[in-house]
């Protein structure tokens, strides 16, 4: 009897350890960057989520550039995005007298954050700017069609542009909506069959049979909807 009790206790401990590993937050870089940008006040000028800049009186373009579309007019690559954040200007723009004059006419100007965010924070911010801007865009025609479809279905409303964000989700196991390009996706979707189950039913058969997983899925604020009749 004592052996059985010890065995049961061991199984319980192993189960708790396994679930603790699954429950450990694993935010993708773009989401870490979004949260850092929010904490740092970036959206005060670049607008909600950085996609709609506020008015900037005195400038010919009238507004602070947003990350969605406008960003590639000012930053051609990741290094230039880093320069904007770290130095408040790219090396290319800094050498332009006309650009400096235009900047000085504006009421608002990009601050130079220097080393405030560290290399990891800087990389996370770059990841978020790219996600908000839709970079890199898919090159494969099937991937392009899929991206257009998930935008049409509203999937990006919770998962963010390209499925790369992880917005807060109170009540869920990890406290956020899982992204499609992070570690969470592999834990939730093991194969194509499970992907279809999530899409059709809002839950996989594996998770539906697990009372612990079902408990957290049911108490989450936004839950994955069933799209059986709309995804085709």
Task: Give names to the regions the model predicted.
Residues 1-35:
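N-terminal export/targeting leaders of redox proteins
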Residues 19-21, 26, 84, 109-138, ...:
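C-terminal capping alpha-helices of c-type cytochrome domains
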Residues 34, 38-63, 89-102, 134-135, ...:
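Periplasmic/extracellular electron-transfer cofactor-ligation site
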Residues 39, 74-75, 116-119, 152, ...:
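Short, solvent-exposed loop/helix junctions and linker helices
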Residues 66, 109-112, 179:
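Conserved beta-strand positions that form and line the central face of beta-propeller blades
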Residues 71-73, 114, 184:
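Structured beta->alpha junctions
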Residues 78-86, 90, 119-130, 189-200, ...:
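An amphipathic alpha-helix signature
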Residues 104-106:
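Interfacial juxtamembrane loops and adjacent helix segments
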């Amino acid at each position: 009897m004592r052996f059985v009790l010890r065995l049961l206790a061991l199984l319980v401990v192993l189960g708790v350890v396994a679930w603790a590993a699954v429950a450990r937050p694993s935010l993708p870089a773009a989401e870490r960057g979004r949260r850092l940008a929010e904490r740092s006040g970036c959206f005060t000028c670049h607008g909600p989520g950085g996609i709609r800049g506020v008015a900037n009186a005195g400038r010919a373009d009238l507004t602070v550039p947003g990350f969605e579309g406008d960003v590639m007019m000012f930053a051609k690559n990741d290094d230039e995005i880093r320069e904007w954040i770290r130095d408040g200007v790219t090396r290319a723009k800094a050498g332009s007298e006309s650009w400096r004059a235009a900047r000085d006419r504006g009421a608002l100007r990009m601050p130079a954050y220097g080393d405030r965010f560290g290399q990891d924070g800087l990389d996370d911010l770059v990841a978020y700017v790219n996600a908000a801007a839709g970079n890199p865009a898919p090159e494969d025609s099937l991937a392009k069609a899929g991206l257009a479809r998930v935008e049409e279905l509203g999937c990006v409303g919770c998962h963010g542009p390209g499925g790369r964000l992880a917005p807060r989700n109170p009540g869920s196991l990890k406290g956020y909506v899982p992204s499609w390009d992070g570690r969470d996706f592999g834990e939730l979707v093991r194969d194509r069959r499970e992907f279809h189950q999530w899409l059709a039913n809002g839950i996989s058969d594996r998770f539906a049979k697990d009372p612990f997983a079902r408990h957290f899925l049911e108490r989450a604020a936004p839950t994955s909807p069933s799209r059986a009749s709309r995804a085709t």
